[in-house]
């Protein structure tokens, strides 16, 4: 009969593919369960209020039109819905595909069963497939995996969350309209069951059997599979566990499958008492906590509570006398095997000959160890016992008492067993690889000895007092030939023949009285020894390794092992070399990967890589978690070193008087530093002792693990310091900004110095790590803060700064800002608010409008540079850019609302435009014309002024940041600054040349050079924020004249001061000149340059008209508004770095030259 799994056996390949797919689906569900977007949980009140109207459960399907019309009625809800779609469609689609594949899985399995029944596979029926060993295994696995899939989904992704995701996918995806979409079936299968994995949650009635019956499955198939599982040892595991008391462990995998599959036929659990008694007697006579898949544990006492027959059958097992007997038995077993294993692990005990002579004994010890570990770990696990269930608590308490349970001792047994297994496997692999060469070597040696003896008896080779004996000579030659004729490939015949040869050599010694000659005896003894070695060597079989692999299975502890983390970490802290022992435990745990990967591998499925990566990644993450205690302990010592170095140890001067040497010696503190440094290097040594290890398919390099661990701890501490250090009280007078920055600067400096100090002792590049991680923390926080301003937000899993191995912690917001960088930015904006302060450009300083006291100055940015570095300033700059964009967008919507929709305003503007046209002329009766327009539009300017001043304020801050970045770059990185400057000038020259002559080259759209160089230039402060285009704009009617009117409406609130320029006239009605100028300049920069030209022409006309009126009325002084307008033009030209002739085109140059002299 054709091999069931042969590639040309379509029937076998089809079911193998289904099972392979099942394992891959479970891995995908487990992977996705860690990425459920928080909004779908609707846990906190803020999410409920914000998203409650756009995230629906299945009640949506009762009347989709009603819900959609509710959305359409509110434009802001539509906007939010669209934003939510853009941010979540990718992850929701991924979840939907996983749900779809679960449904497809059961559809495929049902189709396969139908094909079998209809004879699609020639000569194959359900019965014949179940007769084949592989077929029987695969059919049982196919149904079992479907059950596991459903249970895992319900455990990891709550029913309500699934419903919300499915509805969201239905609403947002175009796929719903396609004819082949099976959305309805998927929704029916995965609708909420009412089950909750929260502790203390009640189990819904008829759960999980009603859930398992949502898609009907062939009943004959279910009952035949249950029949096979009840009667057969489908995986032939009993051969690996010959002792009857290990029977339930041997059948544990099969028991887990039966447990799951029984829910497909719940009548057995309810009423078939005889069947349930048979099942319990075979599979659960001494155990009731089982692992069903990759460490998911179930307590049968709880799970079978609602089922009469199952509960009755299990009562014998759960009888307190039986519980006591089992717990006591495993207590004595674990005591016995612990001593045995420790004996085996003694240095030098496990040698090759000991191993070869004691294989059965060693394997028995391993079996006992693993069975005891399994029973104790499962039956004492917290996850398997509901603390609210009195009976379960009572059983568990009895186990803990009777087994004298001590988690440290159990963990030690696990460590020793893993180490013992590891050594045994390594030795066996070594022996198997050398098996043939050694066997041939022993054969050659034995044969040569016999040839030499034959020569001795021939009389040719003289040996003391050995007489010539032709018979013996011929006999030894024959034996030599017989030894040479032994064939390695026919091990059975060779073994039998070798035994006969040993007997013959013993007999020849007795019959011919050869004992009298010691040398002949020695030759015979040596040959017998070589023949014995040949028998031993030929008995080294791979079956031993397979048995060790089977009995060493630790997949049941995939999740339970986490409860031992604290014990592992404590033992590492006390003795860092413990890491080498843990390596064997991690490798033992890695063997659990065989379970889900076996079928995927057999099917040559492309899922092999992703599933291996998922489980290997999970295990490596766990290894990292355990070993993180080393960096943690190092940092604890490091903090003590920092404290000693900064507070206790005095800096030794370059010149030192001899009599002061004792004062500077400070032997106590220095000894303490040396001791702590030694402890750090011991920890480093500990982790580096763990060799490079392949965990699943991921190579774990201890040096990399150490570095990642140090980075993780550094990130955790620095992120916390930044979060805690930058929380401000907005009511504090004066602001806490500078003191907090100084304090944080000292903390960061401490971290930095300690990192420099430690790098040589742990063999890492301290400065490189420091810069990479601090920049990552700051950039990530800036990204999170900027998400506030983005419609399509960057999720953590999309962020280039966030990492799974070295995660940047997130902290709950303490105010409207999400992160420390937002709080810092808003505090700076608060204290430099143009309504409260006056900015003096020549001094780069802000003063309080009322008290005239200095509020802050450019020193603030030097302090930020010292504390947060270039990354901090650059991040602040980026955040200000986003804020400016938001402010400009708000401004545009306000412009549309106030100016373009108010009829009175429009009429006023029309009248003014007709009065001022043409712009080259002089407006007759100008003061009246302008005053009338200002008066009619007075109410719109307050909101306008606020927006313009905010933009101007942020532009001043950006200028200050650029100056600070540029000066620090020129000091600290002269060559970089010069190179960037040159490259920038060269690029600009090339671009200008292209515009003069289009045949010259120009960077194409797909060329990222300009984007990349811009990032560098902004980080080095080589840019002018005033030239930046922040938003794209359309043509706006009346735009130049509105801005002109706004400006002349503000001029009466200001006055000219010879020393300070334009300052606020009344503190009660504050207007700050620099933010006003820069705000207007920035706003105009966003539009076509002709708007700016019109705006400047209007100001020029205003100055000329006012001057004309003033001279005609023979007023001796220049009007204040004209001075203000002239100063605006002057500042405009200065800030934009334009030539003066731009202003002189609208105002005669002699007025510019002379106006200050008449003030």
Curated annotation (Swiss-Prot):
| One annotated GO biological process | lysosome organization
Cited InterPro entries: WASH_strumpellin (IPR019393)
Record's keyword annotation contains Nucleotide-binding: no
UniProt subcellular location: Cytoplasm, Cytosol; Endoplasmic reticulum; Early endosome
Keyword annotations: Cytoplasm, Endoplasmic reticulum, Endosome, Protein transport, Transport
Please explain the role this protein plays, according to its UniProt record. Acts as a component of the WASH core complex that functions as a nucleation-promoting factor (NPF) at the surface of endosomes, where it recruits and activates the Arp2/3 complex to induce actin polymerization, playing a key role in the fission of tubules that serve as transport intermediates during endosome sorting. May be involved in axonal outgrowth. Involved in cellular localization of ADRB2. Involved in cellular trafficking of BLOC-1 complex cargos such as ATP7A and VAMP7. Involved in cytokinesis and following polar body extrusion during oocyte meiotic maturation.
Q: What is this protein called?
A: WASH complex subunit 5
Origin species: Mus musculus
Primary gene name: Washc5
């Amino acid at each position: 009969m054709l091999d069931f799994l042969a590639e040309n056996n379509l029937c076998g390949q089809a079911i193998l593919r289904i099972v392979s797919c099942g394992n891959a689906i479970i891995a995908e569900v487990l992977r996705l369960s860690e990425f459920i977007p928080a909004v779908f949980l609707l846990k906190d009140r803020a999410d409920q209020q914000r998203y409650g109207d756009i995230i629906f459960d299945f009640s949506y399907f009762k009347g989709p039109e009603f819900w959609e019309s509710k959305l359409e009625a509110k434009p802001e809800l539509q906007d939010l819905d669209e934003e939510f779609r853009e941010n979540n469609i990718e992850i929701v689609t991924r979840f939907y595909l996983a749900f779809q594949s679960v449904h497809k899985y059961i559809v495929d399995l049902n189709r396969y069963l139908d094909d079998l029944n209809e004879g699609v596979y020639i000569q194959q029926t359900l019965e014949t497939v179940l007769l084949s060993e592989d077929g029987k295994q695969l059919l049982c696995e196919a149904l079992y995996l479907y059950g596991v899939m459903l249970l895992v989904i319900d455990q990891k992704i709550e029913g309500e969350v699934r419903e919300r995701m499915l509805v969201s996918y239905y609403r947002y995806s175009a796929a719903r309209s396609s004819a082949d979409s099976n959305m309805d079936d998927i929704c029916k299968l995965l609708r909420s069951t009412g089950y909750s994995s929260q502790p203390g949650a009640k189990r819904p009635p008829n759960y999980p059997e009603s859930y398992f019956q949502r898609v009907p499955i062939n009943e004959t198939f279910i009952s035949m599979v249950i029949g096979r599982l009840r009667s057969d040892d489908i995986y032939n595991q009993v051969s690996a566990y010959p002792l009857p008391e290990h029977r339930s462990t041997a059948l544990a995998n099969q028991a887990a499958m039966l447990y799951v599959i029984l829910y497909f036929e719940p009548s057995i659990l309810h009423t078939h008492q005889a069947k349930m008694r048979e099942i319990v007697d075979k599979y659960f006579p001494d155990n009731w906590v089982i692992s069903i898949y990759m460490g998911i544990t179930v307590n049968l006492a709880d799970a079978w509570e609602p089922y009469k027959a199952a509960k009755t059958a299990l009562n014998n097992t759960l009888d307190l006398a039986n519980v006591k007997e089992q717990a006591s038995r495993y207590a004595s077993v674990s005591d016995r095997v612990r001593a045995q294993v420790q004996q085996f692990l003694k240095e030098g005990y496990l040698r090759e000959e000991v191993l070869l002579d004691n294989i059965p004994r060693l394997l028995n010890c391993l079996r006992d160890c693993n069975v005891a570990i399994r029973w104790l770990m499962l039956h004492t696990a917290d996850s398997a016992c509901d603390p609210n269930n009195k009976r379960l608590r009572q059983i568990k308490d009895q186990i803990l008492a009777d087994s004298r349970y001590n988690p440290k001792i159990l963990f030690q047994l696990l460590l020793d067993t893993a180490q013992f297994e590891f050594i045994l496997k390594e030795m066996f692999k070594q022996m198997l690889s050398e098996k043939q060469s050694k066997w041939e070597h022993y054969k050659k040696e034995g044969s040569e000895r016999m040839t030499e003896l034959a020569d001795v008896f021939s009389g040719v080779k003289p040996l003391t007092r050995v007489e010539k004996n032709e018979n013996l000579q011929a006999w030894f030659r024959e034996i030599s030939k017989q030894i040479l004729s032994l064939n390695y490939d026919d091990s059975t015949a060779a073994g039998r023949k070798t035994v006969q040869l040993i007997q013959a050599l013993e007999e020849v010694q007795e019959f011919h009285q050869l004992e009298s000659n010691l040398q002949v005896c020695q030759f015979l003894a040596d040959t017998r020894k070589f023949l014995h070695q040949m028998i031993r060597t030929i008995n080294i079989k791979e079956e031993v390794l397979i048995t060790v692999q089977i009995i060493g299975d630790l997949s049941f502890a995939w999740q339970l092992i986490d409860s031992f983390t604290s014990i592992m970490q404590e033992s590492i802290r006390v003795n860092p070399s413990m890491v080498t022992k843990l390596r064997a435990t991690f490798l033992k745990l890695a063997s659990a990967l065989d379970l889900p990967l076996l079928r995927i591998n057999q099917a040559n499925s492309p899922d092999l890589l992703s599933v291996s990566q998922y489980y290997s990644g999970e295990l490596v993450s766990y290894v990292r978690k355990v070993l993180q205690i080393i960096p943690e302990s190092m940092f604890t010592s490091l903090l003590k070193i920092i404290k000693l170095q900064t507070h206790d140890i005095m800096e030794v001067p370059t010149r030192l008087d001899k009599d002061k040497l004792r004062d500077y010696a400070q032997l106590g503190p220095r000894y303490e530093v040396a001791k702590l440094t030694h402890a750090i290097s011991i920890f480093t040594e500990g982790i580096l002792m763990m060799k490079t290890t392949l965990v699943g398919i991921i190579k774990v390099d201890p040096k990399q693990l150490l570095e990642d661990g140090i980075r993780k701890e550094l990130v955790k501490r620095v992120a916390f310091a930044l979060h805690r250090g930058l929380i401000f009280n907005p009511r504090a007078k004066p602001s806490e900004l500078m003191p907090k920055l100084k304090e944080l600067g000292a903390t960061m400096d401490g971290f930095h110095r300690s990192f420099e100090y430690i790098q040589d002792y742990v063999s890492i590049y301290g400065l490189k790590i420091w810069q990479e991680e601090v920049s990552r923390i700051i950039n990530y926080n800036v990204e999170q803060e900027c998400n506030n301003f983005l419609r399509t937000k960057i999720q953590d899993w999309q962020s280039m700064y966030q990492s799974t191995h070295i995660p940047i912690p997130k902290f709950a917001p303490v105010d409207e800002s999400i992160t420390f960088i937002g709080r810092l930015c808003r505090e700076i904006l608060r204290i430099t608010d143009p309504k409260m302060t006056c900015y003096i450009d020549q001094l780069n300083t802000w003063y309080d409008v009322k008290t005239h006291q200095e509020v802050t100055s450019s020193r603030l940015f030097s302090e930020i540079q010292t504390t947060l570095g270039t990354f901090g300033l650059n991040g602040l700059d980026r955040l200000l850019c986003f804020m400016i964009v938001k402010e400009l967008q708000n401004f545009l919507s306000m412009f549309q609302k106030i100016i373009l929709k108010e009829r009175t305003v429009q009429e006023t503007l029309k009248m003014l435009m007709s009065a001022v046209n043409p712009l080259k002329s002089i407006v007759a009766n100008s003061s009246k014309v302008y005053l009338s327009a200002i008066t009619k539009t007075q109410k719109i300017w307050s909101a306008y002024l606020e927006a313009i001043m905010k933009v101007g304020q942020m532009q001043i801050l950006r200028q200050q940041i650029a100056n600070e970045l540029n000066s620090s770059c020129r000091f600290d990185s002269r060559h970089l600054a010069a190179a960037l400057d040159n490259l920038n000038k060269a690029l600009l020259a090339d671009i200008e040349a292209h515009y003069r002559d289009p045949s010259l080259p120009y960077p194409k759209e797909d060329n990222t050079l300009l984007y990349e160089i811009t990032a560098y230039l902004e980080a080095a402060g080589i840019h002018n924020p005033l030239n930046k285009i922040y938003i794209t704009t359309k043509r706006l009617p009346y735009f130049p004249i509105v801005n002109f009117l706004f400006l002349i409406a503000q001029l009466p609130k200001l006055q000219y001061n010879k020393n300070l320029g334009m300052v606020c006239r009344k503190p009660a009605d504050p207007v700050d000149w620099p933010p006003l100028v820069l705000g207007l300049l920035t706003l105009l920069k966003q539009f076509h340059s002709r708007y700016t030209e019109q705006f400047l022409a209007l100001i020029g006309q205003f100055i000329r008209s006012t001057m004309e009126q003033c001279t005609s009325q023979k007023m001796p002084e220049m009007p204040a508004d004209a001075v203000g307008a002239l100063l605006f033009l002057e500042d405009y030209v200065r800030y934009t770095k334009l030539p003066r002739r731009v202003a002189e085109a609208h105002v005669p140059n002699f007025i510019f030259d002379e106006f200050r002299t008449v003030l």
